[in-house]
Amino acid sequence: MELFLNLESRPGLIVICGPTATGKSGLAIALAEYLNTVILSADSRQVYKEFDIGTAKPTVQERQQVAHYLIDICEPTDNCTLAQYQEQANQLIQHFHQQGKTPLLVGGTGLYIQAVTEGLIIPRVAPQVELRSQLAQLAQTQLYAYLQQVDPVSAQRIHANDQVRTLRALEVYYVTGIPLSQQQGRNPPSYPICKIGLESEQLTHRIQQRTLQMLEKGWLAEVEFLLKQYGDDLPLLKTLGYAEMKQHIAGETSLEEAIQLTVLHTRQFAKRQRTWFRADAEITWLNGDDAQLLEKLQPG
């Protein structure tokens, strides 16, 4: 396909991005098998161990089909920074280029993808333990509202419930006095990049079905285990889906209400993802509902 013409002369990078639940993972696995290559995850929650079902991590079987990287690289109590992710991703890309492979970078975390494909120059601000402890005493709604005041550009990029990234953006601002969004220069990589975006006209249905499938796989048990293991204050348990299931486990909502809230908040999140990716003119958009999508991507 013409999309891949710039990758014929030397190894590069194929990006598969777009809103959640549009079929990125399925297409990526099929395409990686066809191209005999690997998948690099671009998901800010899949980097954490033990957060499996609710983050839609690839299954053991899928990881046996195709090698996946940048999954389970941090402990749930760690703070995996954008700089750490970028460094590991760049090392892996270089490693596979030396093998003559063009890896796939797959996910819905726009900032992760941007950090790799545009070579963002990220502020090297070390974690501020005391500052984080003070900020963590505030409600996430308060933290996010403050971020909207001091760094509205970063706030637009970060989900309102994402305490990890909210704290990081505030941390950079407190230490340097300059918003994170104003400190990210660029040094784009020299290798060719092909960007594919997926969207779906059946997104609400897909989100509903995926939420139910997660519950069937034992999502509630996963959340209960994480609560017992790490406690109610773990920032990751305040993120999309986990927060709603945690409310249900605490008896604050019925299961049906938790499902409805998860679907609603996921739809809102998907809308923000779409807005983010639509701003990138280099992305070629395809229909994730197309059953012949892989065939259309193949040469000839």
UniProtKB/Swiss-Prot annotation:
Q: Which Pfam families match?
A: IPPT (PF01715)
Against InterPro entries, the record matches this protein to: Dimethylallyltransferase, IPT, P-loop_NTPase
Q: List the residues marked with site Interaction with substrate tRNA.
A: T109
The record's Gene3D superfamilies line, in alphabetical order, gives: 1.10.20.140, P-loop containing nucleotide triphosphate hydrolases (3.40.50.300)
Q: Which UniProt keywords apply?
A: ATP-binding, Magnesium, Nucleotide-binding, Transferase, tRNA processing
Residues annotated as binding ATP are G18, P19, T20, A21, T22, G23, K24, S25
Q: Which residues bind substrate?
A: T20, A21, T22, G23, K24, S25
Region annotated Interaction with substrate tRNA sits at 43-46
From the UniProt record, which GO molecular function terms apply? ATP binding; tRNA dimethylallyltransferase activity
E.C. code: 2.5.1.75
User: Which terms does the UniProt entry file under GO BP?
Assistant: tRNA modification
Cofactor needs: Mg(2+)
Task: Report the superkingdom from the record.
Answer: Bacteria
Q: Which reaction does it catalyse?
A: adenosine(37) in tRNA + dimethylallyl diphosphate = N(6)-dimethylallyladenosine(37) in tRNA + diphosphate
What family is this protein classified in? Belongs to the IPP transferase family.
Known partners and oligomeric status: Monomer.
Q: What is the purpose of this protein?
A: Catalyzes the transfer of a dimethylallyl group onto the adenine at position 37 in tRNAs that read codons beginning with uridine, leading to the formation of N6-(dimethylallyl)adenosine (i(6)A).
Q: What name is this protein filed under?
A: tRNA dimethylallyltransferase
- Name its species: Cyanothece sp. (strain PCC 7425 / ATCC 29141)
